Amino acid sequence: MVTTLPQAFYSNFLGNAPSWYKKAICLFLLINPVIFLISPYIAGWVLILEFIFTLAMALKCYPLQPGGLLAIEAVLIGMVSPHTVYEEVSGNLEVILLLVFMVAGIYFMKELLLHLFTKILLSIRSKAILSLLFSLVAAVLSAFLDALTVTAVIISVAVGFYSVYHKVASGKHFHHDHDHGDDESVHHDHRADLEQFRSFLRSLLMHAAVGTALGGVCTQVGEPQNLLIAQRLGWDFIEFFVRMAPISIPVLIAGLITCVILEKTRWFGYGDDIPASVRKILEDFNEAEKKKMTLQHESKLITQAIVALILVVALALHLAEVGLIGLTVIILATAFCGVIEEHQIGKAFEEALPFTSLLVVFFAVVGVIHEQHLFTGIINYVLGLEKSVQPGMFFIANGVLSMISDNVFVATVYIDEVRTAFNDGLIDRAHYEALAVAINTGTNLPSVATPNGQAAFLFLLTSAIAPLIRLSYGKMVWMALPYTLVMGGLGYVMIVITI
């Protein structure tokens, strides 16, 4: 019961977040300036740990507000300058445009995606084969498109499946409006199946998310840092693929085998199949969609298919920056499907903009890492080692740092340091290329360990589907652990053997 104005202020602070969480954030805000006065370096590492804490507690409170408060304080006390934050943001404008426009573009293709993936889900009975297909498709698409785009597609499909079942489990029909975030209306006899369905969707999403990393490491356009490294080394699409293949292909195969093993053994939270009642509801939904298919609805699906084809070709050929291609998708899909009202278009941006804001906060933390030189000691240590062991150590160092920070930032820092060493004549071209391979694979493969390692994983953690299927930070780390060990371990072995 709020009886005083201070109590009202405290109650409003971070809303419905637990009291202990509010107190923890207040404590962070109080101690950070003190630690910064004692040691800016230690304060920088403390800030990173605090930010990771806000990500880990994403289901308690969306990380934008607590993380944003920490970032604002970091600017105010001088841990990072506003200009550095701006530089980090402007340097990642491509990613921001991607999030704003591409994710919204996918929203306007959700009818087609739900139509296609419903058929796939209902036609494949084996969970292991279905999981393998999701992982493989995500890997192939990520090799030519973008991991965030692929993740957005998978999330859109999962939300579609979940909302259809949740609506029926709550006693409503397919055409009714429904809040699928509220479990109060779910009938008692559906609750056990709902939990199993959540586990089913969690495993599919994690297989697909890891698949984006397995495919993303292979090609020049797979991840933002790949393009950066290719530009530094002067590699084209084919040469980049050939350089990475001795490491990326064995890891891809091992990752797909791991997918099947996890489903068969039911380890690490995998293995739950789709409940029979859920399958029946999705089958009924599919039949209902067929019956109400009009020429106008059919024309929309055809339009979305054509737009999807344009999207794939434009991304594969890199005809423009990804975000601008996303804006093109929005314009084409809405214009030819008759979506012309502002509030209809606005719904598409609801999913992406909170995460885009969070990513800008993340860039502020990356700016702290940059200004306080938090990674410099590790970089200098690795560069000071014997040349024969440097590739393996670069792989490990990049992997560990990418678990903490953004892998694009880590790759940028390392490749620039290595390029400086090459330009200064400290290393030859062959060693420069070997280290570039180690940096690329190191930032792409072990970084699946934590959601903050890869933007696609962070996007999944903070997306609308995560709280619905109870996918927390800790759950993601646990479910990614076997993949981390396989991909990181085999990647290191292949680096040592082949380079």
Curated annotation (Swiss-Prot):
Pfam families: NhaB
InterPro entries, A to Z: Na+/H+_antiporter_NhaB
Primary localisation category: membrane
Name of protein: Na(+)/H(+) antiporter NhaB
Family: Belongs to the NhaB Na(+)/H(+) (TC 2.A.34) antiporter family.
Function: Na(+)/H(+) antiporter that extrudes sodium in exchange for external protons.
Gene: nhaB
TM helices/strands, residue ranges: 33-53, 66-86, 89-109, 128-148, 237-257, 305-325, 326-346, 349-369, 393-413, 449-469, 477-497
Compartmental location: Cell inner membrane
